[in-house]
């Protein structure tokens, strides 16, 4: 799980790293920690990731506040038996990224003089990077960044009634935007 700290009387759990579906883990395993955090009393989840930049008006190295995500092409992490102690069978997903927390992030960025992009995270389960055609499709569908994590955890957090705030480091330009191949090294350098 990670470490637990106390900050202003509140307990804060910090997780380092995550399991990914592309590593062979089931969605139940990928999202297990979110449910454990909820059972421990956590009511807010802050998620971060590094992802490819799909929006051609932006550049690698910028920070994006996640306003929503697209996860259409793989099964749901809620598939299977519903656990009513966490939430209803068919939860609403219209505000998974809590508007109030997004406003707090905007206010903080403004006070610090930081550029904070706002956009939609497009989930692909990998492990291969996306093709240029897939990136064009992601852009047409409204994606601003593309990555291989975050959406499953956020769906489960929403199911559990947790508030969510998400940030993406735009680590590289996505496939086909620049005339160069993608590499894991450029993602690791940025992140």
Where is each model-derived feature located?
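Short, small-residue-biased leader/transition segments that mark boundaries at the very start
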Residues: 2-5
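Short, basic, glycine/proline-bearing loop/turn elements
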Residues: 11-25, 120, 139-140
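General beta-strand structural signal in soluble alpha/beta enzymes
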Residues: 14-16, 45-49, 65, 116-122, ...
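Flexible, glycine/proline-enriched loop segments at strand-loop-helix junctions
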Residues: 16-27, 34, 86-96
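Phosphate/pyrophosphate-binding betaalpha-module
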Residues: 51-111
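Active-site/ligand-binding-proximal alpha/beta "capping" segment
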Residues: 108-144
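A C-terminal functional module that forms or caps the active site or interfaces directly
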Residues: 129-174
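His/Asp/Glu-rich mid-to-C-terminal helical/loop segments that flank catalytic regions of hydrolases
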Residues: 175-191
């Amino acid at each position: 799980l990670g470490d637990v700290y106390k900050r202003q009387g509140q307990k804060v759990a910090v997780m380092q790293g995550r399991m990914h579906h592309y590593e062979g883990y089931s969605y139940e395993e990928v999202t297990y920690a979110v449910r454990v955090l909820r059972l421990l009393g956590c009511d807010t989840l802050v998620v971060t990731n590094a992802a490819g930049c799909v929006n051609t008006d932006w550049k690698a190295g910028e920070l994006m506040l996640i306003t929503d995500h697209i996860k259409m092409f793989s099964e749901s992490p809620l598939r299977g038996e519903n656990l009513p102690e966490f939430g209803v069978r068919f939860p609403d997903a219209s505000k998974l990224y809590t508007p109030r927390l997004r406003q707090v992030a905007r206010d903080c960025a403004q006070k610090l003089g930081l550029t904070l992009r706002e956009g939609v995270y497009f989930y692909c389960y990998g492990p291969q990077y996306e093709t240029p055609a897939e990136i064009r499709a992601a852009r047409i569908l409204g994606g601003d960044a593309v990555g291989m994590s975050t959406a499953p955890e956020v769906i489960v957090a929403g199911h559990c009634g947790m508030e969510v705030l998400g940030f993406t480091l735009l680590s590289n330009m996505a496939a086909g935007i620049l005339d160069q191949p993608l590499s894991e090294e450029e993602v690791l350098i940025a992140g």
